[in-house]
Amino acid sequence: MDAEAGVGGADQLPWRQHYRNLLLLAYQSFGVVYGDLSTSPLYVYKSTFSGRLRRYQDEQTVFGVLSLIFWTFTLIPLLKYVTIVLSADDNGEGGPFALYSLLCRHAKLSFLPNQQSADEELSTYYRNGFTSRHGSLPWLRRFMEKHKNARTVLLLIVLCGASMMIGDGILTPAISVLSSMSGLKVRATGLHDRSVVLLSCIVLVGLFALQHRGTQKVAFMFAPIVVIWLFCIGGIGLYNIIHWNPRIYQALSPYYIVKFFRTTGKDGWIALGGILLSMTGCEAMFADLGHFTSASVRLAFITIIYPCLILQYMGQAAFLSKNILDMPTGFYDSIPGPIFWPVFVVATLAAVVGSQAVISATFSIVKQCHSLGCFPRVKVVHTSRWIYGQIYIPEINWILMVLCVAVTVAFRDITLIGNAYGVACMTVMFVTTFLMALIMIFVWQKNIIFALSFFLLFGSVEVVYLSSSLMKVTQGGWVPLVLALIFMSVMYIWHYGTRKKYQYDLQNKVSMRYILSLGPSLDVVRVPGIGLIYTELVTGVPNIFTHFTTNLPAFHEVLVFLCVKSVPVPYVSPDERYLVGRIGPRAYRMYRCIVRYGYKDVQRDDDNFENMLVMNIGKFIMMEAEDASSSASYDTANEGRMAVITTSDDYDSPLAVRDSNDLADSMTMRSTKSESLRSLQSSYEQESPNVSRRRRVRFELPEEDDMDQQVKDELLALVEAKHTGVTYVMGHVYIKARKNSSFFKRFAIDVGYSFLRKNCRGPSVTLHIPHISLIEVGMAYQV
């Protein structure tokens, strides 16, 4: 009996742990995912009744607005996002770039230049159960893969969605903080609008000024603030239903929607621009999926978010149906007097939490754009030791702050900001609907009827709301359009210039026949050390190498062509990150190393990179020797042959490592350097503490009698070169359009791309290359 109970308890333990983790993630999601969505009741009714709908302020119109809010909130956030879209995650990640990444992997739609077949062998590349032989609409796949213009249009649609999400990062803090602060005017009736705007700006500046500290120190407060806020507004809504108008439940009938449009006509259609604000923030359910699970996000929405917000909208409608004149400040007027100030404080905190979540999402979007080659290089700071992916981008932070304060000061009106906010949110939602339809066809391999039904059902609703928002372009709706145009231009010009640069490198790479004709010395003096040549090419030798050796006919004894590239997956496992291969015969001592990162990976300043590189090359040499022993000699060229080097490889590292931090070893490692270079390095290390604190190691060959002498010689040459020192060689490229190019190309390359390249961070900075070891080779490209 006890044994059976023990077995049963053991079986139940994983289930208990699973549900405990699910509840914990659902609780934490309130502070990250739902902050923006939960603050919508602050301004929905005010924005809806701000225009021509003022002429229809009566109980029946309020019932019609509530019916629209209820069915819109049920159809889009609940049915579309919670039920369907959350299932389209990219290995746990969400957002427009996650959908685009899925499409690029399951159909050849990507513009990433240096992709190779080895990338498709990544464990997270394809969706489980996917097979290209059973795809639906093969003609559509072939059409999009064949026609560059179709793929360009798809990219522009994704960039439009990303630009609008960046616009959300500007508009959400402005409307949320200003709405919460406007509650002061309910009790302090003599307070001027300028004072409310000033207080809002102070809060906004403080919010952005604290971004560099990260959110981990106060993140534990986010979830309880939002939960308290939700229970507050849910309880207030229930109180208002009972106290003011218990018949308000009748408004849930679609009959009142029909009656609403019969009464208001075109004015009611224009008022939809205010009603759509009830679902702003639901895109965050999908975009911020990475830190949670779809099950936890669904659980939080269904059990708490949906009922609390519906109760609040119903309660506010019940209050307004009996207090029509209080429409401009309906939310705060509906709060019972004794709890006004506590609710005001919680509302302000909830607005800050909602703004924080959107700002963090904006940083993530910019990082993804950069990883996919669609945004200039910016500084990315990892702000959390425990939460992977929590980042801070200083340049973007200050741009957002300036634009957010400018919008707040310029408009000073929640309605005008709401008009702009609605355009941005509905555009992002429609982009998601469009991409989801393609996901159903290319990734889920569903029937065309299923995908078309999804697109027509949700797309038609979103188009109606979007058209209503666009009617208010002159009343603030122009702001997100202008912002999106600016950000899209920056993204596409950078993408265009980067692609042209890669195409030039690809067309002008050095042939292997020429390299082999030079012999093992490469027709230059080979000096001790390792030369790391950065290139975007994954095959061949870049022309920067011949350009360098032509002007300075000397190079290092060991050459490594290093390519750091992005692949269209969110994360690359460390065990799959490194691809190592050989260029030319063994005597040439030339290797290729490809380091792969996902679009959500953060490239940290890893002081162990050089050591990892040497270890991986050593592993490759041993693997190649094992393969060659069972086949032909590998003294011949092996160009194009790459191997994935993993930390858990069956081949143990042939190199022994020991710390070399003592003075004697340090001097031994530097013995081959000139006195002036050693002095310069010492000065540099004193000025750069991070460099001086880097771990120094010394490699040694183990005493193995059975090791092949050629392999031992090659490993010994690699170790001695590492101890001599590593030099980084990188091209400093100037790109100019050809004289016969079109006006667009000349403007994009000579003006736009040139300006962005000069004002963004240099590649050596983003790759954390020490300046003391860097050689930049000037190159001029005519594209």
UniProtKB/Swiss-Prot annotation:
Q: Under the GO molecular function aspect, what terms does this record hold?
A: potassium ion transmembrane transporter activity; sodium ion transmembrane transporter activity
- Pfam families attached to this UniProt entry: K_trans, K_trans_C
List the Extracellular topological domains. 43-61, 174-189, 239-268, 320-338, 412-422, 469-475
The answer, when asked if Transmembrane is one of the entry's keywords, is yes
| A Gene Ontology term for the protein's cellular component | plasma membrane
Region (Disordered) residue spans? 662-691
- Coarse class of the protein's main subcellular location: membrane
Q: A GO term (biological process) for this protein?
A: potassium ion transport
Q: Which UniProt keywords apply?
A: Cell membrane, Ion transport, Membrane, Potassium, Potassium transport, Sodium, Sodium transport, Transmembrane, Transmembrane helix, Transport
| Enzymatic reactions | K(+)(in) = K(+)(out); Na(+)(in) = Na(+)(out)
Q: Where is the composition biased (Polar residues)?
A: 677-691
* Membrane-crossing segments per the record: 22-42, 62-82, 153-173, 190-210, 218-238, 269-289, 299-319, 339-359, 391-411, 423-443, 448-468, 476-496
- Localization of this protein: Cell membrane
Cytoplasmic topological domain: 1-21, 83-152, 211-217, 290-298, 360-390, 444-447, 497-783
Regarding the membrane, this protein is recorded as: Multi-pass membrane protein
The text of the family note is: Belongs to the HAK/KUP transporter (TC 2.A.72.3) family.
Describe the function of this protein. High-affinity potassium transporter. Can transport sodium under high sodium and low potassium concentrations in the extracellular environment.
The entry's protein name is: Probable potassium transporter 2
Gene name, Swiss-Prot/TrEMBL: HAK2
